Regions:
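Extreme N-terminal, non-catalytic leader segments
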Residues: 1-16, 37-42
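Glycine-rich phosphate-binding P-loop
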Residues: 16-34
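Phosphate/oxyanion-binding active-site loops and adjacent basic polyanion-contact surfaces
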Residues: 24-25, 82-99, 217, 235-242
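ATP-dependent small-molecule kinase phosphotransfer cores
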Residues: 37-121, 125-127, 131-133
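Small-molecule kinase domains that catalyze NTP-dependent phosphoryl transfer to phosphate-bearing small molecules
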Residues: 131, 149-151, 161-223, 250
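Short, basic/aromatic recognition patches
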Residues: 234-258
């Protein structure tokens, strides 16, 4: 039976990005695109919230989706995501992303091997554990969660400057309060059953890209992707080894035989 299952040498890979608001996602996504482009992979980028333009025709937003100013756009998009999760379930945005992967896949080639070979899907971004759980259930070991780290102060500064630029304002300091509020909502919407929970899923990542690290993002991404393809020339860093020991210790505390 197993002899009839054809092995795919370069299978499709699915990357789901988790980034707190204010962390610059574009640099990390571009690094993944560059790596897989060099590997000869077809790279398809899917932005989760792009589906809002279609969904709002059938499910009218309680708050109309704003295009500008930027801080208002973020707030209305967050509210609509909460509304969709309340109407369906907390994994709804992951489900729509999976549907879009299926649609893209069918346009790639004529044979099953072409459908499932040498394609990297970069899907951004997710905010709930239920979304990640669904993606792992569907794609198994072909799915990788990528979290993007940037310290809070840097995110507030980055976001306030974006708000100022969007409003064509000369100073960004008066936008810092709006940036702080939005970052808090994004991390954990206390009191909102179907709100965003980035802080709850961030550390479950298969890879954390550190925007504040001295090593550039391209090198971090290349190292991770080489490990995916089984490179045996890369040793764990001291930090990675420490994380492994901490994880192993945590698992031992859950051992029912103890």
């Amino acid at each position: 039976m197993t002899d009839s299952i054809q092995k795919i040498k370069f299978p499709e890979l699915i990357f789901g990005f988790v980034a707190p608001i204010g962390a610059d996602l574009t640099t990390t996504v571009a690094a993944f695109r560059s790596y897989f482009g060099r590997r000869g992979y077809r790279v398809i980028e899917i932005k989760v919230t792009d589906i809002y333009n279609v969904l709002q025709r059938y499910i009218v937003p309680d708050e109309p989706l704003a295009k500008s100013p930027l801080h208002r756009r973020y707030a209305t998009y967050i509210a609509y995501g909460n509304q969709l999760r309340a109407k369906f379930d907390d994994a709804i945005l992951a489900a729509t992303a999976i549907r879009r992967v299926m649609s893209k896949r069918l346009k790639i080639g004529r044979t099953p091997e072409e459908h499932f070979s040498k394609t990297a899907f970069l899907i951004h971004q997710f905010k709930r554990k239920e979304e990640i759980d669904l993606l792992r259930a569907v794609y198994g070991r072909l799915f990788f969660q990528v979290s993007i780290y940037s310290r809070r102060g840097a995110r507030v500064d980055y976001l306030s400057r974006k708000f100022a630029s969007s409003d064509h304002a000369t100073g960004h300091l008066r936008y810092r309060h709006a940036a702080e509020e939005l970052i808090q909502v994004d991390e954990d919407e206390v009191g909102k059953l179907h709100g965003q929970r980035v802080a709850k899923i961030f550390h479950d990542a298969d890879f954390i890209a550190n925007l504040d690290a001295p090593e550039n993002i391209g090198n971090q991404v290349d190292r991770f992707c080489e490990l995916i393809f089984g490179s045996n020339s890369i040793s764990p860093t001291r930090t990675e080894y420490g994380l492994f020991l901490a994880k192993a210790a945590a698992l031992r505390t859950l051992d029912l035989s103890r």
